[in-house]
């Protein structure tokens, strides 16, 4: 497993991370097996969020399962990195209508939720805490108070953002100032073969061929993150972005799966491994967040972290996924 430095921090972590959004559906033994599988493949970075508990309909549920699982798997706290996300309020009171009620970057909300996460995870600090989605009502003094309080108390070592555009990140960083402890080190964004808009937007710059619609929805996120030395963390990299779910082995995406199978045969690995390798091939040094709770499938995905795709193979897969080369 290759390691990468997260942002400008001194943290050298595995380039693949385990995301535990669905871990609340597992019992203790199954969760420990998933964590153990990840660790055996070199993973030392684990990503969660305060709202992950959609199966059991309860806040902090996945974090609580992870908090036991990393210990049951025989891992030591000093050997792993734990990351959580906060800033969304979910109403779980009606199991048939679970929904977000607001985004909340108030100091009180962020500090309270982080404390609850620490208790759930069974630790007294997290290595990274990310603002989960942008709060349009966020206020500078509230963000600064929350981050400063949490860092000085030793509860959060580094910070980051998730699902924000470049200008939102710039605004936040302008409030937080130049203190290295307040740097936004990571930016978690959806990215994968069938969610490659960050790339297609940049390829389409100054392009407008007949029949080609050009619209930039990512605001230059890819280049911005590289310029600011923010590590992109790719979430849901195997999702198709459609009603059909994951794309690997899915009959609704025959061209992509044909290409994946061809490359898998060439490199002697699974299609899942190739899909992982595609994300990690980009020189932006993206960290992939894999969320499979199936140990066999997770192992196949993680095998891709050791593959260096040929450039042409990378482009072949990009096109097979329905993306255009202008």
Residue ranges and their predicted role:
Residues 19-29, 96-108, 132, 137:
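Active-site mouth loops of central-metabolism enzymes
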Residues 138-326:
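Beta/alpha (TIM)-barrel catalytic core signal, keyed to glycine-rich beta->alpha loops juxtaposed to Asp/Glu
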